[in-house]
Amino acid sequence: MRKWVTRALAALFCACVLFLCGMTFVPNLREFGYAVFRRYANYLPSNATVFDNISARISAFEDSLGNVFYKKEAFQQLNASLQYAIGKQMLYFGDSTMVKLRGGQLYELRQDEVLSETVYDLVELNAYCESQGIPMVFVYAHTSLYGDSQALLPVGALDYNNETADKALAILREGGVDVLDSREFLRDYPLEDIIYYTDFHWTVPAAREAAEQVGAWLNANGVPADESVLAEDMYEKRVEENIFFGRLGQRIGTKNIAPEDFALLIPEFSSYIKVTHREGEEEEVREGAFEEAVMRVDEAMRRNDEGYSANCYYAYGPHAWESEYENASAPDSRVLVLKDSYGTPVAAFLSNAVGGLLATDQRKTTLSAEDYVAQYQPDAVVVVYCQDMLREKNYAFMDE
C-alpha cells in the first residue's frame, strides 16, 4: 500500500512540475529566445571567452525565468505570509532577504560589498568626456538606508548598503568623477518623503531634488540650465491616497502591507515640450505642456481590480531605450543622461531646464555610452544610477 501511495505522490509531483513548466514556457517562448540570443550580450564581461558566452546566456535565461515564472507572485506572497505567521522579521526569498525598516518600509538587504567593473567603466567614460571637453557628473541614487543604518534595521539584520556605496563612490572620486550623493543632498528630508513603503525606488520629490542638484551642477560647469523651473515651489504637490503598491509590496501581498499614498509634482509654470520615446524600432512622439507630453498620469494612476496601481512610478514616462526631449523655451544646452529607472523622473524634470536632453537606458540599447557621446554631441553628460547598477554588469557601457 505504501508503495502505491509513494508512486501516486511522485506522479502528482511530476504532473505539477510539468504543469508549471508548461504554463511558464509556452506563453513566454519569445521572451526566452530574446534573452538567450539577444539580451545575453548585456551579461558578457570584457574580453569574453566561449565559457563566458555560455555563462551569459544561462544568466539571461535564469533572469527571464525568474521574471515570468507561473504564479510567481502568489507563491511569494504565500511564502511571506507563512514566515510572518511564525514570527520572522526577515523574509527569505531564495536569493534575497527582505526586512521592514523601523519606519515600516520594505527593504532588501545588501549582503556583500562586491562591485562590478562598471565602476571603472565610469572612470574611463569620464576620461573620454574630458578628452572631448565635456563635463560629466555621476548622480548616486541610494536605496532606502538614509541616516543611521543600525537605527533603521531590525535587530540581527546584516547589511552592506552604505559600505558598498562608500567604496564605489571613493573609486569614482579618486578617478576624477564629479559625484552628487543622494545621501548628502537628501539628508534633511524625512525618510517617508524620499523612499516608498512598498517599492525600492526613490520618490518623485526625491527625483525632483536630484534634478535641481544637477541643474546647479550644470550652471557651475558652464552649461546653461534654468534652475528656477526645478525649484520645489514651482510644482503643485498632488497626493493620491492608498494607491501605490510597488514591487516589494507585491512580493508579500496586501495581506501583509497596505498600498500607500503616491505624490505627484505638477509644474505651475507654462511649458511646451516635445518628447520622442524609442524602444527598438518602435517610436512614440508626444508634445504639449509637461503634464500632457511628459507625464502619463491617467495610465500610471489607474487602479486595478484590487483597488491599487503597480504602475505609479511610470507617471513621468516609460523606461525606454531612448527618450529625447526638446524644449524651445529653455536655454540652448544639450544634455545626455545615462540612467536606470531611478533616472527616468530625474530626466523628465530636467527637460524643463535645458533645450535638448537625450535619456538612454544602457541596459537595453546596443550602443555604448561612448557611442552616444559621439553621436549626440552633448554639452554635458549626467549618469543617474542606483547601487544595483554598480553591482551587476548588465548593460553595455564602454567600447573595448
How should each PLM-predicted stretch be described?
Residues 1-400:
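Extracellular glycan-modifying ectodomains
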